[in-house]
């Protein structure tokens, strides 16, 4: 299991068994160019094993004014299977959710700062990103993708937006409460949603990516 650990400001792997009374973790990466991360928030795993993750300041007690903050940039990073770390996005005020398209050719990143947008990037064979563009104009938090390429955006308007691969709004899953993330599970047809103090689930007629 991979974790973006806000408080410990690192990307880690669960190193202990599920039934271990006190969990232990292995740090995969904890900083960039000698400086600690702000507070890693979300992770997307490429089929080649590379990790892409966002690093906004939301886990710092005083946000951007916190004296423990070391990095000026709220970046998006790529950690290769071989352990090489690069910053692939540096111009988003608050990168948050992150997810790959079904063919791994596009990377989506939600920006929770101003302007509130969902960005899309081409993923080059080298692993670098290009062709930065606005995919959809909306505030968003966590992201999930189904096998048809539709993008599920948690966060706005007390629900989850469903946006087609062409960037058109298909509908909204109304939770009546603010949501923070969503992910496919079970047999792939179940979408789990974190919403305030609740964990919700809904059965869909399309599977999530990876199932």
Predicted regions span which residues?
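Flexible "stalk/tail and boundary" regions
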Residues: 14-23, 77-86, 135, 148, ...
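Beta-rich, blade/repeat-based domains predominating
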Residues: 1-5, 32-51, 70-75, 88-106, ...
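Asp-box/WD-like beta-propeller blade repeats and closely related beta-sheet repeat scaffolds
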Residues: 8-67, 73
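A short loop-to-beta-strand structural motif that recurs across blades of beta-propeller domains
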Residues: 10-12, 74-77, 117-119, 159-161, ...
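Beta-propeller fold detector
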Residues: 23-30, 86-90, 129-137, 171-175, ...
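Short loop/turn segments immediately following the C-termini of beta-strands
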Residues: 6, 56-58, 112-113, 156, ...
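Short loop/turn segments immediately following beta-strands, especially the blade-tip
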Residues: 14-20, 120-128, 203-211
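Short, structured patches in soluble enzyme cores that scaffold and shape functional sites
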Residues: 55, 80, 89-92, 102, ...
